[in-house]
A protein has these predicted regions:
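Conserved class I S-adenosyl-L-methionine
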Residues: 43-53
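Conserved SAM-binding loop of SAM-dependent methyltransferases across substrates and taxa
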Residues: 54-66
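Class I S-adenosyl-L-methionine
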Residues: 155-217
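Class I SAM-dependent methyltransferase Rossmann-like catalytic core
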Residues: 1-43
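S-adenosyl-L-methionine
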Residues: 74-118
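Short glycine-dipeptide loop
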Residues: 67-68, 142-148
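Glycine/threonine-rich flexible loop motifs
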Residues: 117-129
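A short glycine-rich, Lys/Arg-flanked "PGG" loop and its adjoining helix->strand segment in the class I
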Residues: 129-145
Length: 217
């Protein structure tokens, strides 16, 4: 880790705030913003957090869903245990994950997943889109009616097509970039609310650039 990176991180107000408040990552502020703006969580909400490590989003969801809420965090990497948080070790694309989740349904499905960065932006963008498609495929199976889906994606020419794939299944779909996202970052979030379980499903396309996703998730 270079000195320049360390200095930039220390100068980051969201990083400092996360350290001060004992949060697991600065990404927690992104989800807090999205909930404040779009009212994702209600008391007692059932939340599925995909690509959850180190757990920053899961803890925000746990706090906002309240003591009667349920949060299931999914990641192949370890997540520190927290009272009320159920951790499932697994990968989103693994068919066994659906079996491990059982028959439960969720009010909110979150995905802050990122691909392994190759350094070729077109490839990284396409892989991020494919991760959203994997998360969406699972969300369509487990979301309760009127539920919400939130997913990170890297900006690029495939995002419009991705939004068109999401839109038939939800009453509202928007794109946004939280203030806590770093200015140079290409990340944005697709926020979909009002899940329609009976909407017809399209066959999932595969981006040629993402033929080998090589994801961390």
């Amino acid at each position: 880790m270079g000195r320049r990176f360390v200095d930039q991180r220390r100068a980051d107000p969201y990083y400092r705030a996360a350290q001060r408040e004992g949060l697991r990552s600065r990404a927690a502020f992104k989800l807090a913003y999205l909930d404040d703006r779009f009212h994702l969580f209600r008391p007692g909400a059932r939340v599925l957090d995909l690509g959850a490590a180190p757990g920053g989003w899961s803890l925000i969801a746990l706090d906002r869903a309240g003591p009667t809420g349920t949060v299931v965090a999914v990641d192949p990497r370890p997540i520190a245990p927290t009272e009320g948080l159920r951790v499932v070790r697994g990968r989103v694309g693994d068919p066994a994950l659906r079996e491990r989740l059982g028959s439960r349904s969720f009010d909110v499905v979150l995905s802050d997943m990122s691909p392994s960065i190759s350094g070729a932006y077109a490839t990284d963008h396409a892989r991020s889109v494919d991760l959203v498609r994997s998360a969406l495929e699972l969300a369509l199976r487990v979301l309760a009616p009127r539920g919400a889906f939130v997913a990170k994606v890297f900006a690029g020419d495939l995002v419009d097509e991705l939004v068109l794939e999401v839109r038939p299944h939800f009453a509202e779909v928007v794109r946004t970039k939280p203030p806590a996202s770093r200015a140079p970052s290409s990340e944005l979030y697709v926020v979909a609310r009002g899940f329609r379980p009976n909407a017809p499903r399209r066959e999932r396309p595969v981006s040629p650039e993402a033929a080998r996703p090589d994801s961390d998730i």
